[in-house]
Structure formats: C-alpha cells, structure tokens
Amino acid sequence: MRLRFWGTRGSIATPGPGTNHFGGNTSCIELTTPAGECIVLDCGTGARLLGNQLIANAASSINATILLTHTHWDHIQGFPFFAPLFVPGNSFAVYGPEGSHLSLRDVLAGQMEHHYFPVELDQLAARITYRDLSEGVHRIAGLQISAQRMNHPSATLGFRIQAGGESICYLSDHEPYCEEVWRDPAQPGHIDSIRDPGDRRHAEFMRGAGLVIHEAQYTPEEYPAKRNWGHSTYAYVVQVAAAAEVRRLFLTHHDPSHDDDFLREVERRARELASQLGSPMEVVCAYEGLEVVA
C-alpha cells in the first residue's frame, strides 16, 4: 500500500510562510491499494489538490472510495472542492460513521446548501453512493477494513486497513480516556500496563500495525486548557503506540498555532520519548507531500 499526505493540519487551514514545510491544508490522505484502487482518507482542504491530481493523471473514469472519520469541518470542507465529483462517468463510494441524528449524506448535503455553497450535493455529476458505517469489520474496496469508535465529541471512527499481510491504522480524532496512561508510571511499556480500559482498547486496535497515522494536536503542556475537545497529545500517542508495538508512527492533525519550528521540536520530543520507552518505533511528524510505502 502507498500513502500520500495531502493535508496534515487540524481544525482550520493555516497557509503562510510559517507552515511551508508541514503544510496548512486540513486532513486528507491518499491510499493506493495493492490492486491500484484509490482510497481517500478524509476530505479536508487537502482534497482539492488531490482531486486535481487525480484528474490530471486519469486515463479513463475515476472510481474511488472515500472514508470519512467524522464530519467536522476540517475533515469534510474539501469535499465540495474535490473536482472529480463534478465529472460525469466518475464513481465514488463514500463511507462515514453512523451515530448522528442525520445520515452521512444529509450532513454532506448540509454544508452544500445554497446558504454556504453555490452547488448543491444533488448537482454533482459523478455517481456517488453513501453508507453509514458501524463499528466492526467491513469489506470495502476489496480490503478488510475494521472500524472502531474514537473518543471525540461527535461520532468518529478510526480505521484499520489490511492488505498483503500489512496493516495501516488511521486514527483521527481521539482523546485519551485517562491522562495517566500507565497503572504504574515506574513500569510502562505494555498494553496490559495501561490504566484505563478505553485506552487499552485503543492500543489493542493498533496492536502490531506496521504503520499508524494518529492525530496528536497538543503538547502535554497545552492539554489541560483543551480537555474534552477530543484530541491527543503527542506523548499519549507515543506511549500507546509503543505499547501496541507499532513499527512506524506518523503524527498528524497539527494544531493551527504550531508552526514548522514548533512541529520540529514536537517531533524531536516524540522520538526522545519513544527511545526512553525502549521502543524501536520510527516516529515522524507528517507533512504535506510526504509519500510512504507500507
């Protein structure tokens, strides 16, 4: 499987000279399956550039899958600007979490009402299907994709995608169930040592994954003022991923206030923490344009 990051920012797009390296577009990742199928992970503002590239490279009609973790703005605002949706003959299957009083289709239609956007959902020329997903194991785009609830203020799913003996987890957005990760801080390191059952379940979901993409919007110092907003610290993410014996960890959903220099320091501190835990896990702050093979 191949991945390309088209948007790594959380909350709101933040273009400017201070975000040139890590990027200012909100959440969007392109996954290409071993069979050459395209799966779009979230449709934040990064989806616009991805859509333009898909059209430029298309030799025929575009058929793709869109997996939405949830429907907060930073994960769907690129949907109306995703140009392949406007092309007759293209086909898309769009999946997102059940649990709202509105269907996934109705939520996406809501942001495209004429109050907010000149083109309504029903005017899109591509063939589009919508499905509300529950927790569990699903067969999507020829792959086994598991979905699990994240700890976030709206209905949100994390995904584990399996192909060719490899697993990729995409986990955004998620807040720790307990600020203290370990039962005994003097003995960290294993899933069984994690204090809260919710955090243990979260770690189990990514156990043994070759590659995990996890939101890490805050530092531990910032978190107390952001409690219950539905986001993690890099320290929490490194600890649960190390306990789950993840091989490669990519931190994303960067806070809009974090410029390139700040995120380089986050990356340094996250790697240092992994080393302190005795984990060989590779830790990277994801940036726009980053391409990864899993």
Language-model-detected regions and their locations in the chain:
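Binuclear metal-dependent hydrolase catalytic cores
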Residues: 1-183, 260-294
